[in-house]
């Protein structure tokens, strides 16, 4: 979706994202980011790039993600600098996202820098560059040129889905550590394509949480956020609450839980009785998110992710699906509730806010 906004609206979005007033809550900055993503264009690339000076790794990681999803080559120099990280200001989570964004844009000119950092000392960066190279090479191939993305999932994925197959075969490829990561990612996204209603596919994906790669585990959590399947809730909670789990995995698990905005199969179907180790604590998922959002000893990325996830949860369960930037929705006082689509919860809330502008191009 691409929309046109007035200079005043663009200024409001920019000020919100960049925290010009100095007191903008993180979840509002996230929503402004995804509203800017819906607008697109060179000016948005410049605004989002400016945000990479922010001290929050969580926000910078999301900024890099959006730069990739915009598919604008204007972002290539910025993303390359973040990956190179000459001043040491960007952590591995942000650098990984910059590499993934280069893969998303898919420019052949990005191959040399991605190949260079396939030798990086950080595993997540190395692996991301490997996958990004695989994606660009695939996109440039004859097979890639004939491959169409799944229209049910409006995102630029790190790897195209594998050819349709049965779940056991895809699960075998997903878990086969002797295969290239790019091939395993293709199996991962093919399992995603079975949809939220396939318990077997969700459980196959959840088995991937046992993998030794934090990058691999974090991508599964991201996919669960897209699917919004109640079947994924127990495994996501397990990742979030595991203090030994990598921060980037816990971050994705938190945001996925916020977007799912449900207490799972048992709450939606009272006749279903879950095993003891899959039952929710008192207060449900939201209570867990609230606990970690204020936990003093939680890593900053995890704590901030839970704060954003709480906002996502509240949005998904809101009767009016509000837009915090009220001035941008004044053109339409009432709007039908936006249907849930296969995007992350934060992006869904931004899409609703953009729709409320009533100016979709």
UniProtKB/Swiss-Prot annotation:
Binding site for Fe cation 2: 218-219, 251-252
HEAT-like PBS-type repeats: 59-85, 94-120, 183-211, 216-242
Pathway as given in its UniProt record: Protein modification; eIF5A hypusination
Pfam families hit by this protein: HEAT_2 (PF13646)
UniProt keyword Transcription present: no
Principal subcellular localisation of the protein: cytoplasm
EC number: 1.14.99.29
Keyword hit for Lipid biosynthesis: no
Gene3D superfamilies the record matches: Leucine-rich Repeat Variant
Record-annotated disulphide pairs: none
Coiled-coil regions, chain positions: none
InterPro entries xrefs: ARM-like, ARM-type_fold, Deoxyhypusine_hydroxylase, PBS_lyase_HEAT
GO molecular function, one term: metal ion binding
UniProt keyword terms in alphabetical order: Cytoplasm, Hypusine biosynthesis, Iron, Metal-binding, Monooxygenase, Nucleus, Oxidoreductase, Repeat
SMART domains documented for this protein: EZ_HEAT (SM00567)
Binding residues for Fe cation 1: 61-62, 96-97
Required co-factors: Fe(2+)
Any GO CC annotation of this UniProt entry: cytoplasm
Reactions mediated catalytically: [eIF5A protein]-deoxyhypusine + AH2 + O2 = [eIF5A protein]-hypusine + A + H2O
Localization (cell): Cytoplasm; Nucleus
Bound cofactor: record note: Binds 2 Fe(2+) ions per subunit.
Family of this protein: Belongs to the deoxyhypusine hydroxylase family.
Its job: Catalyzes the hydroxylation of the N(6)-(4-aminobutyl)-L-lysine intermediate to form hypusine, an essential post-translational modification only found in mature eIF-5A factor.
Name of the protein this chain belongs to: Deoxyhypusine hydroxylase
